[in-house]
A protein has these predicted regions:
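Nucleotidyltransferase catalytic core that binds NTPs
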Residues: 1-212, 245, 252
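Phosphate/ribose-recognition catalytic cores of enzymes acting on nucleotide-derived substrates
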Residues: 202-254
Length: 254
């Protein structure tokens, strides 16, 4: 049994996870649940796109065997025998500005694992920190579920696919494209071992000048999210930025 947990509003990134799951000749389960516990009080829970009818149609076409759409009361009241451990990496990157996010994600994913009992679960590289947190949780609790990370799917402009991209106006979309274009220029600069903080600070300024409203973070870490001592092929660039009311994240390997 292979599980792809989603919040619905499916796009080609989600469907890549389903395709990868399908390749492994398993029972393909996709869950759709907009998890209220991972949203902060001023975040977009109420506005998050809900397109269940279309999602079901698309998943049928892509060969999902089971679509699990629990009602909120059912899943929130489900008890598991485990308590979710906490990890230092939850406090970094998205965890700094979204303190509810990882506790909420872990709580629901653990419940889904308990109900579905998957042999493997699929997560996207775009949400790299989430993938690592879930991987650490399964290892810490000794769950018999392999966590598989699937490469980020991007549109023709390089923008990583996200359900939240639908929030962007035409002008905001043009600004969002510039984030990836600038991000792609950074690895060769960083590999020269010039002053990395100077490069990142300059990039932040350029993004703000191009219309990005806020940079939540732009940083280089090792791929286990530990602080880098030196740049290597295990280093990644991570960014979170706000354009209007829309928060976008991305990461690329150096």
């Amino acid at each position: 049994i292979h599980l792809t947990p989603t919040m619905g509003a499916l796009h080609a990134g989600h469907l890549k996870l389903v395709k990868e799951s399908k390749k492994l000749k398993s029972i393909v389960v996709v869950s759709i649940f907009v998890n209220p516990t991972q949203f902060g009080p001023k975040e977009d829970y109420k506005d998050y796109p809900r397109t269940l009818k279309n999602d079901l149609k698309v998943l049928k076409k892509y060969g999902a065997d089971i679509v699990f759409t629990p009602i909120q009361k059912q899943i929130l009241s489900h008890k598991t025998k485990h308590n979710c451990p906490q990890f230092a990496i939850e406090k970094r990157l998205c965890g700094k500005s979204r303190p509810n996010y990882f506790p909420g994600v872990k709580n629901i994913v653990l419940k889904l694992f308990d109900i579905v009992q998957p042999d493997a679960a699929f997560f996207g590289e775009k949400d790299y920190q989430q993938y690592l947190v879930i991987k650490k949780m399964t290892e810490s609790l000794k769950l018999n579920t392999r966590i598989i990370c699937v490469k980020t799917v991007r549109d023709r402009n390089g923008l990583p696919l996200s359900s939240r991209n639908s929030y962007l106006s035409g002008q905001e979309f043009k600004i969002a494209i510039k984030i990836n274009k600038l991000l792609k220029k950074l690895p060769p600069l960083i590999r020269t071992k010039l002053k990395i903080n100077k490069i990142l600070n300059h990039t932040k300024k350029v993004l703000i000048d191009h219309g990005v409203d806020k940079i939540d973070y732009l940083t280089v870490l090792n791929d286990d999210l530990s602080v880098r001592k030196k740049i290597s092929d295990k280093s990644r660039i991570f960014i979170a930025a706000k354009i209007g009311n829309t928060r976008l994240i991305d990461n690329i390997k150096i």
